[in-house]
């Protein structure tokens, strides 16, 4: 491949790209939008400042540096750490949350999306907030705001953002709609058919909370607007559109009418805030569909971008696009870290962004100028009809990649001769093997690093005193197979291929534990339960409230039998109780509906005459139609939950009337929602990890690493394997590294502390200067999260969430563990 130095070869760009980078100040792909940047620190103010003892924000502080100035736990005594307390949520499922600690209060999530406040010194439960939405989700933390007089805690519950009183956990009714706002509102189309959720907590700046969201990765998907809401009222303060409309910068990088239908280009990874400059740095992901872009020809700004936005107004200051016309799901996967580095004897405030490709980009915070050279390199072109691949992609020259960049015969596993031979045989059937190989029809395309990075959502840690960044990374390969979508097939299989096969595979077998098998699903669940998961989502799965009527029934039949029900067959009778036909909550006066009498007789004793409930023990039913759909509420009514008894005798027409009274909406059963969800010309057959016959990676170790890079020079200080498989270690194959999710923290005590490894149930502390392992502690389950550290009553603690959800070989739970010195 030939490279083009960004600062001298900009004139050789294709004309379409020149048009959008004409203001690039001599640097291709980094665009400056004229805007006054100078802001006095006193004018901006600091909405959240980390004291030496607290951890008041996701990532430690708004800069996302994962740094603590605490030194009580240090290199000399870290080996003496012991368990100080544990908090067992009593639940099983994924916890990826990093607690926020303010004073002696610790705020975090349980696997079922309850928010809890604990005594940070003892782990004692102080309060619980239960929204009534118990479907697991990848919620990685809460946001804390204070102006010194009042304070608020913000918690995402899938499509809702709640404002809670940090002292009591009760919703603040003056915020939004009685304590929450619905993030689906204000996007494109009918918000009740949209799906969005807060994977990462919002960023706080002054008196606004800035949010992105996780969007579906298939059509239809809402646009990935970045929005700021007033922390007191919930009112929208500003919006930045990542899919530009006519007249907006970047519009020319899409087809003419793409803004009407294109989706995602969203921020799910989190953000960093420079409070003195008043800038929020926003990494975005790819546009849908992830693996085929024939309907979005062009570079697709502002997908896969690092955005610098004025945090006061949302105005674009500069951007850098890391992947043009993404066909590989190469989202920027983590919030950037703010750091100050030395350049030519001067200190330069910088922003560091890690990538799934195993790269790190470093920019001047003020103007977006790259601090290390970046080349636009020619890349392979697609042979798929209708596709229009970008001719080049940007590649940083420094630092060198923190993962290997390709797989070949020399880099396959040598765990056993048989494993190597099997891996070699598979490799010869694949296309690709490295970066930016477009999908080839009907042939597995090998992607390395895989869809899980490189770097991932845990983010990086930066020591502000040295300018050294610490990054954990995955080094396993995945394959995807692009296939033509048979539009002559029936509704069930077309809907499955369009919405489900991306994760669960064409054969419904998935890639456990991340993507569970759907074979035999109806042996474990009822039809309404499956429909509820489809409509609300679960874990990393987005919700699909747009799937109703014929499409939903046909999909359920296909999931139940593996046979397609076809376009004309209504299979609701085969999958359990039918979904009652319910009018839109806005179309009728709830008090005029006959269901009011049934509610008074059966529900009001617990939930109150005005549906207000007594949270958290008895949830309010006000607005339940914005949290749950008809399938979910029907399932709760018929089967009960917790202290609520079942009411199986409530059936239509009384059931429909009750649901109307509660404001619960769905389409009429049998109606077609009319979207184009299954009409993409191509889809993929799922994510498949390149493994040997025994389930270990088919590439050579290390399979996971921890890396230290001096950002002043771009040079590595050290690189070590991170994690191991206990069963391999028992046979003498140690320090292989494993897949790891969650990030590190770094302290003034000279330590890098990280759990993250999928299989060995360990948390470790390393010498930040040398990478030497100084301590490891055992956990009840794997700690797939980023730890936090803080001091209460003169004692420093390290706390980590554990759950085991990524290890199908072992049990799961939901336990927080805190360590301290004796």
Cite the ranges covered by each PLM segment.
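Extracytoplasmic electron-transfer domains, predominantly the class I c-type cytochrome c fold
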Residues: 197, 279, 494-567, 590, ...
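Extracytoplasmic/lumenal domain signature
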Residues: 77-90, 115-135, 148, 161-193, ...
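Repeat-blade elements of multi-bladed beta-propeller folds
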Residues: 55-59, 94-112, 136-161, 194-220, ...
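N-terminal pre-domain segments of enzymes
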Residues: 37-71, 385, 390-424, 672-683
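Mature N-terminal segment immediately following signal peptide/propeptide cleavage
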Residues: 43-91, 98-101, 706-707
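Electrostatic cytochrome c docking/interface patches
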Residues: 477-495, 511, 563-598, 614
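Bacterial N-terminal signal peptides
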Residues: 19-34
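N-terminal secretory signal peptides that target proteins for export/translocation
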Residues: 1-16
């Amino acid at each position: 491949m030939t490279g083009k130095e960004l600062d001298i070869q900009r004139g050789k760009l294709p004309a379409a790209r020149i048009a959008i980078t004409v203001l690039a100040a001599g640097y291709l792909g980094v665009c400056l939008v004229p805007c006054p940047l100078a802001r006095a620190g006193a004018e901006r103010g600091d909405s959240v400042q980390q004291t030496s003892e607290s951890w008041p924000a996701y990532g430690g502080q708004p800069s996302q540096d994962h740094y603590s100035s605490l030194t009580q736990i240090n290199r000399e005594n870290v080996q003496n750490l012991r368990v100080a307390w544990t908090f067992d949520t009593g639940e099983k499922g994924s916890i990826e949350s990093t607690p926020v600690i303010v004073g002696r209060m610790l705020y975090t999530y349980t696997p079922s999306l309850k928010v809890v406040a604990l005594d940070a010194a003892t782990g004692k439960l102080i309060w619980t907030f239960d929204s009534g939405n118990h479907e697991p989700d990848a919620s990685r933390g809460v946001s804390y705001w204070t102006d010194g007089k009042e304070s608020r805690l913000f918690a995402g519950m899938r499509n809702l953002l709640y404002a809670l009183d940090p002292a009591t956990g009760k919703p603040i009714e003056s915020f939004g709609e009685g304590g929450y706002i619905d993030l689906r509102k204000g996007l494109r189309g009918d918000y009740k058919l949209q799906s969005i959720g807060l994977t990462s907590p919002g960023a706080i700046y002054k008196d606004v909370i800035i949010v992105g969201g996780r969007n579906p990765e298939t059509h239809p998907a809402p646009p990935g607007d970045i929005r700021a809401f007033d922390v007191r009222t919930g009112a929208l303060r500003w919006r930045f559109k990542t899919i530009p409309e006519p007249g907006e910068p970047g519009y020319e990088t899409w087809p003419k009418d793409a803004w009407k239908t294109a989706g995602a280009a969203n921020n799910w990874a989190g953000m960093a805030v420079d409070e003195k400059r008043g800038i929020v740095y926003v990494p975005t992901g790819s546009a849908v569909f992830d693996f085929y872009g024939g309907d979005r020809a062009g570079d697709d700004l502002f997908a896969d971008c690092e955005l610098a936005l004025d945090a006061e107004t949302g105005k674009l200051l500069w951007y850098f696009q890391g992947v043009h016309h993404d066909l590989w799901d190469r989202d920027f996967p983590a919030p950037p870290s703010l750091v100050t580095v030395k350049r030519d004897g001067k200190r330069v405030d910088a922003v560091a962004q890690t990538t799934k490709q195993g790269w790190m980009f470093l920019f001047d915070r003020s103007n977006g100028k790259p601090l290390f050279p970046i080349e636009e390199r020619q890349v392979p072109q697609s042979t798929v009809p209708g596709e229009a691949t970008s001719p080049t992609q940007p590649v940083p020259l420094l630092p060198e990649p923190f993962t290997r960049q390709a797989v070949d015969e020399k880099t396959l596993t040598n765990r056993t001769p048989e494993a190597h031979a099997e891996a070699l045989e598979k490799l010869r059937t694949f296309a690709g093997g490295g970066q930016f190989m477009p999908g080839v029809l009907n042939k597995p395309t090998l992607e390395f690093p895989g869809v899980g990075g490189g770097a991932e959502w845990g983010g990086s840690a930066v020591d502000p005193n040295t300018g050294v960044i610490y990054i954990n990374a995955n080094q396993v390969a995945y394959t995807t197979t692009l296939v033509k979508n048979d539009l002559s097939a029936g509704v069930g299989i077309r809907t499955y291929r369009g919405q489900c096969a991306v994760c669960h595979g064409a054969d419904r077998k998935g890639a456990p534990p991340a993507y569970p098998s759907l074979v035999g699903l109806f042996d474990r669940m009822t039809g309404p339960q499956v429909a509820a998961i489809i409509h609300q989502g679960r874990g990393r799965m987005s919700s699909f409230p747009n799937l109703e009527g014929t499409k939903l029934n046909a999909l359920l039949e296909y999931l139940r039998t593996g046979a397609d029900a076809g376009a004309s067959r209504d299979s609701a009778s085969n999958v359990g109780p039918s979904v009652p036909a319910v009018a839109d909550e806005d179309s009728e006066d709830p008090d005029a509906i006959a269901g009011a009498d049934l509610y008074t007789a059966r529900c009001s004793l617990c939930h109150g005459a005005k549906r207000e409930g007594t949270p958290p023990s008895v949830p309010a039913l006000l607005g339940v139609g914005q949290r749950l759909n008809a399938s979910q509420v029907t399932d709760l009514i018929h089967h009960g939950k917790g202290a609520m008894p079942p009411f199986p005798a409530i059936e239509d027409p009384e059931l429909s009337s009750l649901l109307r009274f509660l404001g619960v909406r769905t389409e009429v059963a049998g109606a077609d929602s009319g979207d184009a969800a299954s009409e993409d010309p191509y889809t993929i057959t799922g994510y498949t990890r390149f493994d040997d016959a025994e389930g270990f990676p088919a590439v050579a170790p290390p399979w996971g690493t921890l890396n230290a890079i001096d950002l002043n020079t771009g040079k590595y200080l050290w690189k070590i394997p991170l994690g191991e498989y206990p069963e391999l270690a028992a046979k003498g194959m140690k320090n292989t590294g494993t897949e790891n999710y969650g990030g590190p923290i770094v302290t003034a005590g000279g330590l890098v502390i990280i759990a993250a490894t999928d299989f060995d149930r360990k948390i470790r502390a390393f010498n930040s200067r040398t990478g030497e392992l100084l301590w490891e502690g055992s956990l009840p389950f794997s700690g797939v999260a980023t730890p936090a550290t803080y001091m209460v009553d003169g004692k420093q603690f390290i706390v980590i969430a554990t759950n085991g959800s990524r290890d199908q070989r072992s049990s799961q739970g939901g336990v927080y563990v805190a360590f301290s010195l004796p």
